[in-house]
Design a protein with these regions (language model features):
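Terminal, low-structured helical/coil segments at or just beyond the last alpha-helical repeat
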Residues: 1-6, 182-217
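Structural signature of tandem alpha-helical TPR/SEL1-like repeats
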Residues: 12-25, 47-59, 81-93, 114-127, ...
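Helix-start (N-cap) detector for alpha-helical repeat units in TPR-like alpha-solenoids
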Residues: 1, 34-35, 68-69, 101-103, ...
Length: 217
């Protein structure tokens, strides 16, 4: 194994010190290779050394402006720092550099939601689900965006898929109930809100919505 592989293995085993040592040696061995800088940056990010991590990601980008993993890593750091505008910029750069995986599309969608741009987030979350059908959280967030844009029939379909895959997803039951309420399907709305409460008895939003619908009858 080379030093990068040794470092990644050590990092996966939780041996931060050994990983740092290996990545340092990899940088010394190949100072013009962006990969060990990215690896070291990911290590620093994992222990919340955000500023140092950004310095290493930046070094990797200086060495190779198409290093998609460096842009993606920096985007994650800015997300953790709650600087969502910078996070969005770096995730977009990762996309331009050729990265195409579900995590990137999900993170880009999430940053746009944080920036209160759910309409722009929709295609990214949809793509995240297309690339990884097991990503139920991306599917749920996509449903939330659909509901926000009053695309209620599509939201119902999406939330139904979420609860089919995860029958314990209280928020999906709640939002499905709300969507049915807006579609004036009271029986279905009450059924879904009831299921949200079954899963999470202290779900205040579901309890409140259930009460409103019952009082309106």
């Amino acid at each position: 194994m080379n030093y990068n592989e040794i470092g990644i293995e050590a990092l996966n085993q939780g041996n931060i010190e050994k990983a740092a040592e290996a990545f340092t040696k990899a940088i010394e061995e190949s100072p013009k290779d962006p990969v060990p800088y990215i690896n070291f940056a990911n290590l620093l990010s994992s222990i919340n050394e955000f500023e140092r991590a950004l310095n290493f990601f930046q070094k990797a980008i200086e060495l190779d402006h198409t290093a998609a993993a460096a842009y993606y890593g920096a985007g994650n750091v800015y997300t953790l720092k709650e600087d969502f505008m910078k996070a969005k910029d770096y995730f977009e750069q990762a996309l331009k550099a050729g990265m195409e995986n579900s995590d990137l599309f999900y993170m880009l969608g999430q940053t746009l939601i944080k920036l209160e741009q759910p309409k722009l987030a929709m295609p990214y979350l949809q793509r995240a689900v297309e690339l990884n059908e097991e990503d139920n959280e991306a599917r749920f967030q996509f449903g939330m965006c659909l509901a926000n844009e009053h695309m209620l029939e599509e939201a119902v379909t999406t939330f139904t898929e979420v609860i089919t895959r995860d029958p314990q997803h209280a928020d999906a039951f709640y939002n499905l109930g709300v969507a049915y309420a807006y579609l004036e399907k009271k029986d279905e709305a009450l059924e879904m809100l009831g299921k949200a409460i079954d899963v999470q008895p202290d779900h205040m939003l579901a309890l409140h919505a259930q009460k409103l619908i019952q009082e309106a009858e």
